[in-house]
Amino acid sequence: GKDVGPGVAAICTTALLKHGRSPDDPAVARSLKYLQTFVHDDGGIYSPESPVQNYETSLAIQCFAAANMDGRYKSLLAKADKFIKTIQSGGEPSEFNYGGSGYEPKKKRPDLSNTSFLLDALQASGIGPDDEAVKRALVFVSRCQNLETENNTTSFAAKNPDGGFYYTPAAGGVSEAGQTDEGGLRSYGSMTYAGLKSMIFAGVKADDPRVKAAVSWIKKHYTLSANPGMPKPAQGLYYYLHTFAKAMSAMGLDVLEDDKGIKHPWRHDLLVELAKQQRPDGSWVNVDPRFLEGNTNLVTAYALLALSYAQSGK
C-alpha cells in the first residue's frame, strides 16, 4: 500500500526472500516494483522529504541485494551504496561524529543504529572490511562501546565500563536506557548486539578486546523475553530479537554459555519465544508501540528475519 513507505516494504520483502520466495513471486515482484518508485537521482531509495533517508536506503539495499541473484539490480545497488557512503559523517577522525551515519544528510548527529544499518547494507552488497567507508564506520562503532581502549577515548567508557553498547557518543552522548549515577551511558541489548554484529562485519576478530567485552556483556544479560537494559523491557523487543539473531549467526555460534555456565541453544530458544508470541492470524506485534513496534507489518518482518537467521545460519 502507498502508506507503507519504502522502509517497511523493504524489510517485509527481504523477509519473504529470506524464506525462499523468488524475486519473480507475484507478491515479491510487486513489492520490488513499488520500491523502485522511491529511487532518486542521487542513488538514494527513500520517500520524498524523508527524515530517515539512511534507514530507508539501507533497508532497500538489503532487499534488492537479496533479490539480485541474476544481477538485475547491480546498477541500482551500486548507486545506492554510493549514496549511503556520501551521507556518512566525515570530518576529522578525532571528532565523535566521524564515521557514523544518522537519519539524513541534514541531521549531523550519527548513531549506532543508523551506522549498523549502513554496515548491514554494505555487507549485503558484498563490500568488505577493506572498504574505506567500513573502516570509518568501525571508528564510530568502537566509540559507542562502554570500553576504554585506544579505539575509544570518550569520557563515557570509564563511567560505565561494562563492555556493552549505547546509542551514540555524539551531541553530548545518548543512551535510550538512560544514564548511570556517575553520568555514564547505560548499555542495552539491541545496541550491544548491533555493535557486536557491526564489528564482525567490519572484520574485527573474536580475540579482539572489543569483541571479548561485548560477548562478556551478552553472557551476563542473555534473554529473549526482554530488551535487556531498557527501563521498559518490551521497548524495541523485536528489533532486539532480529539484531540478536543476526549477530549470533554472524558469530557462528550455535550455543552460548552464559556467565553462570548455563548453555543456551539460541536458535531453539528463539523459535520457542517467537512461537509463544505469535498471534492467531500468524502475525506479531509488540505490546509496547515505541520504535514503531505497534506496526504489525514491521514487527512481523522483524520476527521472520530473526527466524531466517535461526534456521539458515546466514
What are these regions (language model features)?
Residues 32-38:
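Active-site-surrounding "flap" and adjacent substrate/cofactor-binding loops of secreted or lumenal enzymes
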Residues 1-28, 41-82, 87-272, 276-314:
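An alpha-helical repeat/solenoid feature that recognizes helix-turn-helix modules
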